[in-house]
């Protein structure tokens, strides 16, 4: 017995109709029962309670996605950690009486020496684009202050690029450096806690910029390094060390930190009397 599905245009029900053809005279219509009203009510209420789909981000006529202005007003995650957790802990630990005494990260200076590529316009432009993608800010060219014959450098020649980060861009770069850049470094065991300069400033050297996800990996390509100098308002290295530790800087545990006390180098004019040489 063969069963065929037939759609009846005159049928008021929108449900499919099945007919069993036993003979040309006897035709029996088998109608599927409609779903109960309770199921329809539950489906309608679920659709009403579902959260609305987020609207697509606005785009300009050229196709560029426009960012909501309120996004720029939000506090960065690392900045919120500093305000809510770091400031109370350091204030209690060092006994500060004023909020302005609490050390903070003032700026970050990223420097990249180019060497022989500084004289190549394509290499210089490529290095500037890479550093701009990493830091989020376009760098400037650094030029030699004096001529050095052994390095074939003349005064005024471009020898590298540098960028100074402050504010939200600074916290964004520091967050990615701590959580993405340093952990992806090969054979990384932590940064040296003795890399302070005695005035609360910390310097990190990276041999490869490819540890940042913004730089694509190229087999056989030249690897450019970079120097990262974190400038803080701390008066001593212990305060700066504690500040960066609370921010998440992975210091090496097998290296003992020591307070660096550097004396000012006395030059020849320091030993000369003030009245000497005057007539």
Swiss-Prot record:
SUPFAM superfamilies: RL5-like
Subunit relationships: Part of the 50S ribosomal subunit; contacts the 5S rRNA.
Protein encoded by which gene: RPL5
Pro residues biased stretches: 51-60
Pfam assignment, any one: Ribosomal_L5
Record-given protein name: Large ribosomal subunit protein uL5c
Function: Binds 5S rRNA, forms part of the central protuberance of the 50S subunit.
GO cellular component: chloroplast; ribonucleoprotein complex; ribosome
């Amino acid at each position: 017995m063969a069963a065929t599905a037939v759609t009846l245009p005159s049928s008021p029900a929108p449900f499919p109709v099945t007919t069993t053809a036993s003979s040309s005279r006897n035709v029996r219509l088998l109608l599927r029962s409609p779903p109960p009203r309770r199921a329809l009510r539950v489906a309608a209420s679920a659709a009403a309670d579902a959260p609305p789909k987020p609207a697509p981000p606005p785009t300009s006529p050229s196709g560029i996605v426009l960012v909501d202005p309120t996004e720029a007003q939000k506090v960065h995650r690392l900045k919120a950690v500093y305000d809510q957790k770091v400031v109370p802990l350091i204030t209690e630990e060092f006994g500060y009486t004023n909020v302005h005494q609490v050390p903070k990260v003032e700026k970050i200076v990223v420097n990249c020496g180019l060497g022989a590529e500084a004289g190549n316009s394509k290499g210089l432009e490529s290095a500037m684009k890479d550093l701009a993608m990493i830091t989020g800010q376009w760098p400037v060219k650094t030029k030699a202050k004096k001529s050095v014959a052994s390095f074939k450098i003349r005064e005024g020649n471009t020898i590298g690029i540098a960028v100074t980060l402050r504010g939200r861009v600074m916290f964004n770069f520091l967050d990615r450096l701590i959580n993405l850049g340093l952990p992806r470094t090969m054979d990384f065991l932590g940064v040296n806690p003795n890399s302070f300069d005695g005035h609360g400033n910390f310097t990190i050297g990276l041999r490869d910029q490819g540890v940042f996800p913004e730089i694509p990996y190229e087999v056989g390509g030249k690897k450019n390094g970079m120097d990262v100098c974190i400038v803080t308002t701390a008066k001593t290295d212990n305060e700066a060390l504690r500040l960066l530790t609370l921010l998440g800087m992975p210091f090496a545990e097998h290296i003992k930190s020591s307070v660096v006390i550097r004396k000012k180098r006395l030059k020849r004019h320091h030993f000369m009397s003030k009245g000497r040489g005057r007539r």
